[in-house]
Curated annotation (Swiss-Prot):
One of its GO terms (biological process) is L-leucine biosynthetic process. NCBIfam families: leuD (TIGR00171), PRK01641.1 (NF002458). Its EC number is 4.2.1.33. Pfam families: Aconitase_C. Pathway: Amino-acid biosynthesis; L-leucine biosynthesis; L-leucine from 3-methyl-2-oxobutanoate: step 2/4. This is 3-isopropylmalate dehydratase small subunit. Keywords: Amino-acid biosynthesis, Branched-chain amino acid biosynthesis, Leucine biosynthesis, Lyase. Belongs to the LeuD family. LeuD type 1 subfamily. It catalyses: (2R,3S)-3-isopropylmalate = (2S)-2-isopropylmalate. The gene is leuD. Catalyzes the isomerization between 2-isopropylmalate and 3-isopropylmalate, via the formation of 2-isopropylmaleate. It comes from Yersinia pestis bv. Antiqua (strain Antiqua).
Length: 200
């Protein structure tokens, strides 16, 4: 996995609370088990006027010219609620998002995000309100999300957030569960050599 230390990116404001995983990636697109190819279906029912023609909805935030290429999603409370599909962070990262900033996240989505190198940043509702206004008034504004310092820098101000130290360590060092295991490969090999022949 790629290391996540600091990210600078354009911000797209999704001004909706309780965005569930079925809105993020509808169930009809879940047949695949690989992590790629889901970005084209991200927010499918909101991005397109109908599923057959795939005509873009001109009013949806991700279709607006000013937010093309956004890599940071600004959202409202309880983002990622609903079913526990891991396809939701897959779709967000495949579309190009590196960070989601919101007042709160559904627990399962929050864990899945870290597992897929998508950084979920929790800020207070007051700070989120300020950031929505900032993005609305400043076309092309970029945020600096610093995982080492645990800050979001925007509009000349710094907003502090907290990440569990273990998860922070894993993201900064680009470690997934396999990578963590391989860090102890020497100890695992030594233990295996100590086992009786019939257990090897």
């Amino acid at each position: 996995m790629a290391k996540f230390i600091q990210h600078i990116g354009l911000v797209a404001p999704l001004d909706a609370a309780n965005v569930d995983t079925d809105a993020i990636i509808p169930k009809q697109f879940l047949q695949k088990v690989t992590r790629t190819g889901f970005g084209q279906h991200l927010f499918n029912d909101w991005r397109f006027l109908d599923d057959a023609s795939k005509v873009p909805n001109p009013d949806f935030v991700l279709n607006l010219p000013r937010y093309q290429g956004a890599t940071i999603l600004l959202a409202r409370e309880n983002f990622g609620c609903g079913s526990s599909r891991e396809h939701a962070p897959w779709a967000l990262t495949d579309f190009g998002f590196k960070v989601v900033i919101a007042p709160s996240f559904a627990d399962i989505f929050y864990g899945n995000a870290f597992n897929n190198q998508l950084l979920p940043v929790t800020l207070s509702e007051a700070d989120i309100d300020t950031l929505f206004q900032l993005v609305k008034e400043n076309e092309g504004i970029e945020f600096v999300v610093d995982l080492e310092q645990q800050t979001v820098n925007a509009g000349g101000k710094s907003y502090a957030f907290e990440i569990d130290p273990f998860r922070r360590h894993c993201m900064i060092n680009g470690l997934d569960s396999i990578g963590l295991t391989l860090q102890h490969e020497h100890n695992i090999s030594a233990y295996e050599k100590q086992q009786p022949e019939f257990l090897r």
